[in-house]
Regions:
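Interfacial aromatic "cap" segments that immediately flank transmembrane helices
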Residues: 2-31, 82-107, 154, 171-225, ...
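Short, small/hydrophobic-residue-rich motifs at membrane-helix boundaries and re-entrant hairpins
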Residues: 19-39, 47-73, 93-153, 160-169
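Outer-membrane beta-barrel domain signature
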Residues: 31-44, 220-233
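Selective recognition of hydrophobic, aromatic-rich stretches within alpha-helical transmembrane segments
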Residues: 44-73, 150-191, 227-264
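A cross-kingdom feature marking solvent-exposed beta-strand/loop segments within repeated
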Residues: 74-82
Length: 264
């Protein structure tokens, strides 16, 4: 199956299972209502309660994402029915996997940041503190800082930022396949087996996988744009966007990711 066929299949998947899709959409409806309540009633206690319930709902939705992929791996064209307990457990596993995959580049970036930017930033702080001892005029302090030092600081920060961006993109690409691996094996350890995930992407075809990601990104951008426009409708916009657009997008992405995974 080529990438375009995968996209067509994933796009038609919710429409071919309208009843089950709408059941899943109820979760998004609940989340949308909670968001609207938080906006309409600015009460600290209500915000906390709504926040906790919303997090639980989002975890269950993540579990639904896993169940859709699992159903796809079984060569089923049906959207699975909700199973709150199973979905909640799967959602927690999903969350743990995602946190770890994005924690790795964060730690690497922080480790790199200290030797690359540490000395320059410390030097800048020392110079600034010395200048501040003589004047409280912010403009004079900024103008007195050597331009070469400012350039060195910005260049070092820029290098770290570019490196971090590349790392996050790489681990983002890995995490998509890792989530599919989690759905396939129901094992977080298997999902964290990065060498296996890399081999899986290679078996899919790096070019094919990147092409797939680009198309999913573009489609998701359109979904976000439509969702944003609908959300601008007073009082009911967020609820409608959550119920229809966001639920459709999640089902689409889950199906598409499972199908590209099966290509490897």
């Amino acid at each position: 199956m080529d990438v375009i066929e995968i996209m067509r299949d994933a796009m038609s998947y919710p429409l071919a299972n309208v009843k089950n899709w709408l059941v899943i959409a109820l979760l998004f409806l609940i989340n949308g209502i909670l968001q609207q309540l938080a906006i309409n009633y600015r009460n600290a206690y209500l915000t906390v309660i709504v926040g906790v319930i919303s997090v639980i709902v989002l975890i269950v939705i993540s579990g639904v994402f896993i169940s859709i992929m699992r159903e796809t791996f079984d060569n089923s064209s049906e959207i699975p029915m909700l199973n709150p307990i199973v979905n909640l457990v799967d959602g927690i596993k999903y969350l743990i996997t995602q946190i770890i995959y994005y924690l790795i580049p964060t730690v690497i970036t922080l480790i790199l940041a200290f030797p690359v930017t540490g000395s320059k930033v410390n030097q800048l702080l020392m110079v600034t503190s010395q200048l501040a001892a003589n004047t409280t005029n912010t403009t004079q302090i900024v103008n007195a800082i050597p331009q070469s030092l400012l350039i060195d600081v910005f260049v070092s920060i820029g290098i770290v930022a570019i490196f971090a961006l590349i790392l996050y993109i790489i681990f983002g690409l890995l995490s998509n396949i890792a989530i599919a691996r989690l759905a396939e094996t129901d094992d977080i350890t298997a999902a964290l087996n990065i060498p296996y995930i890399i081999k899986k992407i290679q078996s899919i075809g790096i070019g094919k996988y990147v092409y797939f990601i680009v198309l999913v990104f573009l489609v998701s951008f359109v979904f976000s744009l439509v969702s944003g426009l609908i959300s601008a409708i007073p009082y009911v916009g967020i609820i409608i966007a959550s119920f229809i657009v966001q639920s459709f997008a999640i089902v689409f992405i889950a199906r598409a990711t499972a199908l590209i995974y099966m290509e490897g």
